[in-house]
């Protein structure tokens, strides 16, 4: 895969992730603002969802998909050389990443496409850890407790646990542990990205194969 193809793949995934996270963040605040991207498929939540339900779905999306954004960026940076700003896979028109304006553009893109989703995840996580999860027994919710409690040995795909107030199905202990692990992976890859960008800046620019000097002969 060429660097150009990798950048196209990365920017597509990064923008889609950013749009979803911003929309979910706004939904937890009951905001009417939403970013819309026309796609062959539609990701849409029920307008009647509670704040906690949006937070649960947002953390699921973040944990499952966001780690790919810094992962691909790390892969791009490891194949780059000559400039830390050029190692970041964002490109805006024909602005040279090594130039002064280019460095500002790359820095802003890093904050928006990498840092903002992480900050949104922190916001969603603060909502999730304060939730109550209840056992679903005979069309009733009983034995409500926090997300780290699991009094019944239920399977991860059944309807044993739901959020209080008849929210979505949520598997306590299992889901938060997986979310913490995958979020930690995302944070690690983000830190690794910064390191690889610095390393790229210290590597000499790859110039490719230089043509051999012509052989000259002199006749005396």
Curated annotation (Swiss-Prot):
Stretches that traverse the bilayer: 9-29, 54-74, 105-125, 177-197
Any one GO cellular component localisation term in the record: plasma membrane
Predominant subcellular localization, coarse grouping: membrane
Keyword vocabulary terms for this entry: Cell membrane, Membrane, Plasmid, Transmembrane, Transmembrane helix
Annotated localization: Cell membrane
Disulfide bonds: none
UniProt key word Cell membrane: yes
Membrane-related topology note: Multi-pass membrane protein
Protein name: Uncharacterized protein y4fD
